[in-house]
């Protein structure tokens, strides 16, 4: 029985992880569940899965949870608890599915504690990739990616010599606004941006998909995960979401991971690696119904997020921190109705153009850069609100 700590158990990835654990209750047990403030869902999960420990990072929500919780799990409150709970002896594997750089310190602590690691948090590598890779190398930890694209790349590299890689082909669905012009995007609302054509995801990830900032984050993530130069990472649009990503080798061979879009598949593989279990949905591709596989290049003039991601990544140091933090602030402002959809790109571009990259030397340096980038982005947002 493998004991799993699910950090972010009430979110989109977290609930689908719990689905996988439910399907394979003979193999897995959720020894730890953790959420920010979704305590009703957390209470339901506690009743069903009987964890040994529960973490609520929001203080107020944690206090409210304790008022009605009558189970026997250890209840820990506050963000710092995430970094403590991953060290528990009753944890074999940590799946990090919290949002934002909140995931960085628990990831580092899980590696230091010798735990298996499944990573679903893009920001951890985008902001702190240098730190995470250094610790992973030191402790001989294999980072198992949960993102469908990075899982696909990971699977396409199994048994291959990394020196033989020519290029990573990172696929994107194109989001709800694929093929739109700048003029057509000028009046986009939050409701419009939440209509993803393929995946059912949380709000932040769905909005990032609409702007293609998610793909920008994934470019930087792929660089760190697989040690591939930015010039050898190419984004392509595959609107059917059948090809989840590909690896092209120096002899011209392309290895691809293809399958129906179901996030439980990469989650399950991260938990069972190197073994495979039956499909959670028991659904398979019916090739007789697929007349063609569509491939296109992304419009990097409309979706400047991709160009900005490459720029941020090539800055090295804390360029990724600035990219991520300014995007998060811009998304918040868009949701609040303070800026337009297209202004999201402007805020990140302005932040990066005024950014002087510094080395990432510690967790504290990441937090410092994050605060600086948010302040800079907020200043640009304020000007756009005038």
Language-model features, listed with the residues they occupy:
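Catalytic, metal-anchored helix/loop core of enzyme active sites in primary metabolism
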Residues: 1-386
